[in-house]
């Protein structure tokens, strides 16, 4: 059996989310998973880049998250890589998120999957979409910070 991961280790990150959205509020949600999905997560076979969170009947669901089944997965279960996964949050948090998502321009995006006390958690964020010029501005700011850091580093030598 594989070694259990560190309690706070990350499984997968959604780097595209920070580029495409203004992240406003973050939440940590539990996930309802099948056994083969947990094994795939332990092996690090997860991808969040196309994932998004959908609200249906007062519950949160993670869609578009790819979990590739291991070759040693059970023969009597047919694993589906893009299966919809239910997210677990407190009722008050879900109500608050429903109210904000119904406002124009807000959506829920998954940021990362990580282990916490032997359980898989999904960090989600309430986000607003960035326009193209906002993306360009954030790239310019990031490059400006890099240049300043380079200048300070070379000056200190």
From Swiss-Prot:
Domain of life: Bacteria
Region listing for Disordered, in residue ranges: 133-157
Keyword hit for Translocase: no
Matches recorded under InterPro entries: SmpB (IPR023620), SsrA-bd_prot (IPR000037), SsrA-bd_prot_CS (IPR020081)
Key word Cytoplasm present: yes
Single GO term (MF): RNA binding
Alphabetized CDD domains for the sequence: SmpB
PANTHER family: SSRA-BINDING PROTEIN, TMRNA-BINDING COMPONENT OF TRANS-TRANSLATION TAGGING COMPLEX
Job description of the protein: Required for rescue of stalled ribosomes mediated by trans-translation. Binds to transfer-messenger RNA (tmRNA), required for stable association of tmRNA with ribosomes. tmRNA and SmpB together mimic tRNA shape, replacing the anticodon stem-loop with SmpB. tmRNA is encoded by the ssrA gene; the 2 termini fold to resemble tRNA(Ala) and it encodes a 'tag peptide', a short internal open reading frame. During trans-translation Ala-aminoacylated tmRNA acts like a tRNA, entering the A-site of stalled ribosomes, displacing the stalled mRNA.
Protein name per Swiss-Prot or TrEMBL: SsrA-binding protein
